[in-house]
């Protein structure tokens, strides 16, 4: 019966994790360039099969009867499917068609800078004429430098990432891509940062000016999934309440016999 409590408890933890992911997706359904996340679950038999095949620690022998029932919360993942484009007619609003990210220079509260990557191309010019994000982070060129433009001249962003003013090429956007997106992790609202093992590759994305890539979250699908997760959570909760009631009855019966 205690195993039943543990099984229901792990089920609640799993559903809570899925609920957190879904609510975050819904909260960012209107965030430009946001990529939805998903949650995975490992069943007991999958975990058992993994440990049976794992020979890294031969002294860790599990004898008959020492079963750990329940569900194991797996890793969360990001769905990098491209979102729909929305027309803005603002030349500094950029969208990427294909795989790739804009490179930006992020500065933390301590003043330390680092390169982050984003699909959010809602850029502006600051007072100095630098191309920056809506939060003021510098957009980087192909050489990792800030992009300074003349606000008095017409600016054209070409599909290959080059920037021209009055017909003269003045800079080129840094469009980065990676061989395996599993080595990218969320940072803040719309940034991604590579982790150890991430490798760069040539990006094949095209730049479209006057458009913004919307979130790839489908609100209806997320709501339906959230309802299902909520019901599963409540089911596990009722199992725990039932077992708790049964244990309480058993304890009272033992007192009567005493």
Give each language-model segment a name.
Residues 1-257:
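Amphipathic alpha-helical polymerization modules
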């Amino acid at each position: 019966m205690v195993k039943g409590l543990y099984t229901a408890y792990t089920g609640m933890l799993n559903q809570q994790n899925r609920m957190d992911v879904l609510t975050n997706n819904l909260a960012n359904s209107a965030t430009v360039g946001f990529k939805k996340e998903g949650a995975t679950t490992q069943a007991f038999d999958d975990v058992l099969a993994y440990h049976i095949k794992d020979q890294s620690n031969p002294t860790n022998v599990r004898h008959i009867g020492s079963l750990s029932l329940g569900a194991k919360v797996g890793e969360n993942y990001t769905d990098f499917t491209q979102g729909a484009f929305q027309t803005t007619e603002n030349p500094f609003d950029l969208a990427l068609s294909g795989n790739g990210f804009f490179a930006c220079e992020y500065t933390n509260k301590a003043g330390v800078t680092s390169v982050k990557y984003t699909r959010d191309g809602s850029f502006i010019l600051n007072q100095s004429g630098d191309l920056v994000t809506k939060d003021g982070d510098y957009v980087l060129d192909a050489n990792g430098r800030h992009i300074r433009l003349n606000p008095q001249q017409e600016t054209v962003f070409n599909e290959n990432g080059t920037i021209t003013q009055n017909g003269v090429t003045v800079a080129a956007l840094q469009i980065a891509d990676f061989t395996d997106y599993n080595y990218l992790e969320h940072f803040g609202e719309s940034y991604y940062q590579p982790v150890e093992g991430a490798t760069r590759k040539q990006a094949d994305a095209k730049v479209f000016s006057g458009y913004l890539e919307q979130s790839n979250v489908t609100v209806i699908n997320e709501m339906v999934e959230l309802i299902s997760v909520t019901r599963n959570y409540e089911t596990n909760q009722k199992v725990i309440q039932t077992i708790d009631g049964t244990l309480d009855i058993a304890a009272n019966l033992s007192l009567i016999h005493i």
